[in-house]
Amino acid sequence: MDTDKIIQDLNRRFAAPLPEFYQRRIIFWYDEDKEFQDKLDEVVLENAKVIALTGNNAFSVKKLLSVDDLTTNYLVYSPCVYNRPDDNWLLDVELYSEEFRADLISIWMDEMGLISNPAMRKQVKNYRAYFNAKDRRLKVSTQNKVPETPAQLHMAVMAAICGLKDAQPNMILRSVFQEGLDLNNNTVYQDFVKYHADAAFWAMVRQGCGFVEEEPDLGQLAIHLLLTAATRTMRQEYLAGLDSFISIPHQAYCYDFISEWLHSDNITQLYDVARYVEDKARLYQRFEKLTVEDLVGTECFPCINEVILTKLMTEISDHIIDVDTITNTVEKRRTCVWYEPFENFYDGILQVANMQSFFKEHSAGFHTAEAKSIWKEYTESYYQMDTYYRLFHLSFQKSLETSNILLDDLFKHVVDKVEGLYTHWFLGELGNNWSDVCADELATYGKVLEVPQQEDFYRSRIQTSDTKVFVIISDAMRYEVAATMADQLQRETQSKVSISSMQSIFPSTTKFGMAALLPHKELTVEVWNDILTVLADGQSTASTYRDKVLKKEDSASVALKYNDIIAMKRAERSALVKGMDVVYIYHDTIDEASHTSDTAVFAACDKAISELKNLVRIIVNEFGGTNILITADHGFLYTYSPLKEEDKVDKRGFFDVNVTNSDITKKESIKRCVEYGRRYAIMQKGVQPDYLMPVKFLGGNTEFDGFAPRESIRIKMNGGGMNFVHGGISLQEMVVPVIEYHYLRNDSMEYKRNKQKYDTKPVTVNLLSANRKISNMIFSLNFYQKDAVSTNREAAIYQVYFTDEDGKQISDIQKIIADKTSDNGAERTFRCQFNLKSLKYSNTATYYLVIADEQGLQLPQREPFQIDIAFAVDEFDFFS
């Protein structure tokens, strides 16, 4: 500010009206840097005298102002700096006088609303390069808290450079790391250097983290931070030899910093930083020597997942499957931050544990004497083995999309073990038992007695319905897939859902299964152009004729395709079902996927479930349907591993052995074998192919006989498609699901009477531990899931942490995935370890344990606690 402007401003202020009770005006002009000392003689005011403090005339000036002259206006020029208030003899006069500053630092401080004192002025001068731009000054003045001390000003400048509104050390440090570990290319750090904030940054790091290095190095700092944090959940002896990177006195701060970052929205850079530390400290090689139990509680290093999975998958490959260890480990690790990149591997070995548990329950094999009893066992429990196998291979296929060099081959070895459990033991043992006990009934009747039949579907389910009925037929949706969907429909919709089964017609192929589901008195076959065609009362049942067959029985019927419906506008598809009593909707996702690739089938099962649930919503919300049946034409048999020769039967018995000419052989094969697939053969009567079971074909009212391989054996054929098959008599192929879905309107009597039963709610988690007093910075608590996940109780995820009375978080966050299905309450418990932040805690204050639904749909639970820790420390007072 130039002298003329100073004189103008001072004249204006002295000319202003005096405050009440004031007889004159005294203004102190502070100029600690003595910028205007040489220009003071130029300052001549209209209505005030000018006097200057020299450092030696304080007494005479005070006498002048307080005794000698009580009426004249004075401008007191003060270039003095006092170390203590007592050194300032004019302090009492200053307190009732006005203040004026004309130096740049003072103007900046006034602009930013900073307290003016020597210490603050010193730091503003230190950051002169930063404050030289108005937009940068604005970043400091508009922070959530205006700095009041030099320490706070250091933080504020660093926070402003980082683009932060809160000057928190953790966020400043995180912002630096997010720009990379190379100081030369780290834009935030280079700005610290540019604006002289780098010294403050390293002072903050030294005080908070205990990191001291002669040469600044973010890589070394990262190693120090993560290793020190790890000692909070891992015994320090496991990191022996790395002691120079660990500061136990700063353990709490380092753990808090890493924990907060782990549970923030932006953890991508932390993953890279953690990987860097793992590499430099050779942590993978170190952790390999530890046990799973030693590692399972530490989450900051991604490689811990690789070590744990390597150990567990190696054991599985060596035929050591500890169900409890695998289950408990996955339970613990799935709440960790770095779980997602390894989720497919963990899910896979969890299914191995489920399969092993099933194996232990049935290790004696399957020796049921009656076919209907095996059928009952399969539909009540045995089918779960098919589900475990499907879920395992879903995880395995997904893992192939995101390669992990350490785990990929190991997972493939696990696949071999799974194939042994499922294909050789389960399908072999159960298939052998089933083939033995059903052979006579299939040969004599073509069906299992006392089991509902697919051929009776329309007669027993549709004709007897007194309301409009929608029938969804999903090609190749086997029973276990339908069971999964039924469970989801029950939990996700306001409905009454049940699942039952019926035996598919033989052979369990699309054209026969689809025909069996149509109205008919009799199914017959004819050979048209060398192709076996299925007729319902003389009418073709091919896809283009199904609408006609339905309308013949009931004119208010219609056959639709799922793909057509989905592509239509709402009004268009609603018009198609208007006035109809029976609506058949054909869905083909699973079987269609098998035509592309056998390995795509299990993923298609998941897709089919999603599509069918959506179709149910369309029927309910757009078509007004309340009565829906979901079924299939047949199931399927799938095994991943290549089949061995002993898993196949030759079809030489299908042909006339005396014919050698290839053309004649072809004609003879058509004559002797009307149709065959990998799992069935339809032969001319009298033909007895080797190694196949006879199955009475269409009640014996045709000129053909049916045959099927035992167990999961395939008939040799050219081409692919050996792994995904259907048409045979295995339980996986023949057990056809029937889901009965009844939507319950709010005004329905069933819903009103059983509202508690049908309303789906998330399961809740409560504190089990009785003690409400905390006496250590690290402690554990037990929790329990109140209800088991069931038809009307869905899984939920909870975040659990501690807060003070004002709601400020004072601990790390623990996650509880409440999805336990056991009816045994002791099996629905969780144990969480908490780490309190480095704060000062009062034993008279109330603190709260918060149990919060991750989706925020429920009111958080708050349990009061007392904290009594004798040596708890306060937050770091940085730069003190």
What are these regions (language model features)?
Residues M1-K468, R478-I628, A632-S880:
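…; additionally, a secondary subgroup of soluble metalloenzymes is captured
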Residues I472:
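Beta1/beta-strand and adjacent pyrophosphate-binding region of the FAD-binding site
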